[in-house]
Amino acid sequence: MSMKGISSAESDKLSRRISLTHKRNSEELDVFEAAVYFGYNEASSGDHGHTQKYGYNAAREENPRRWGILGGGRRISLDLPIRCSEQVYHLQQDHHEKHEVTTIKERLGNVRHKQPSSPGGKIASFLNSLFHQAGSKKNKSKSKSKTKPTDPEVEEEIPGGGWMRRRRRSSISHFFSSSRSTSTTTTTTASSSSKSLISSSSSGFRTPPPYLNTPTKNYKQFLNYTSATKQVGEEETKTNKEYSWLDEKLKVMESLSENQRIWSDDEDIDDDRRIKREGEDDGMESDSSSDLFELQNYELSRGGLPVYETTNVANINKTHI
């Protein structure tokens, strides 16, 4: 057989056969190649009979298990697995397409409609978002109040000027719940203590009863009260000491005031005496002045003038001239 009689298809088959032998030597897993299988069938429809026989024998030698050359020498058809694989492929493709369609629909549903870019539209969208937030927060607060109706403090959220203010209010039910909880705790502690006593008596060992909640707060309050009383007592002693020297000062002032009174009384007596003496002296001087005045009047009367005009200054000056 010459090199000219070998076609290009046969050269391809030879190269594939060489690659398969290399794979076998490398201990790799054999994989069914549909292109090689159908290539052999196409080559069998050629003009040269020797090429047909060569391709058939080569395929059988390459993978005898795939051609069904087993212990019995029967041939297994490969059409059935090919059809099954095609059906599985179509089913997978349909499932993938359906999944893509559902995801696209979900995306389109989640996409919000675009609002106009005008300032009025922006303000409207802003107000809508505020109202939506307020409504959602109110619903949350209502749900919290329903789930926890006996909370001591309930938070209320009030919208005001774009900001949320929180306000707390105390509920009276908290006191009832606390009283109930304390009563239940006391009953449980009493029952547990009785059970422990019974168990200890039955076993023969005596265990101490469980201690109640230690009144740490009351103890602290008592300490604070005692410390406060001590401080008040110390302050009172300090004030008493301060008032003691004030009392001494007051005594000194009273003694001084008594001395001043005595001295003032003496001065008053001396003043009275002086006034009496001065009064006596003034009477004597007045008599002498009146006598002189009368003498002058007598002199004026001697000049032949009337007595009732003697007090006039002009007349008196005339008489002296």
UniProtKB/Swiss-Prot annotation:
The keyword Cell membrane applies. Residues 135-147 have a biased composition (Basic residues). Residues 134-217 are annotated as: Disordered. It is found in: Cell membrane. The keyword Transport applies. Keywords: Auxin signaling pathway, Cell membrane, Membrane, Transport. Residues 172-206 have a biased composition (Low complexity). It comes from the Eukaryota. GO terms for cellular component: plasma membrane. Signal peptide: none annotated. One of its GO terms (biological process) is auxin-activated signaling pathway. Belongs to the BIG GRAIN 1 (BG1) plant protein family. Involved in auxin transport. Regulator of the auxin signaling pathway. PANTHER family: PROTEIN BIG GRAIN 1-LIKE A-RELATED, PROTEIN BIG GRAIN 1-LIKE E. This is Protein BIG GRAIN 1-like E. It comes from Arabidopsis thaliana (Mouse-ear cress). The lineage of its organism: Eukaryota, Viridiplantae, Streptophyta, Embryophyta, Tracheophyta.
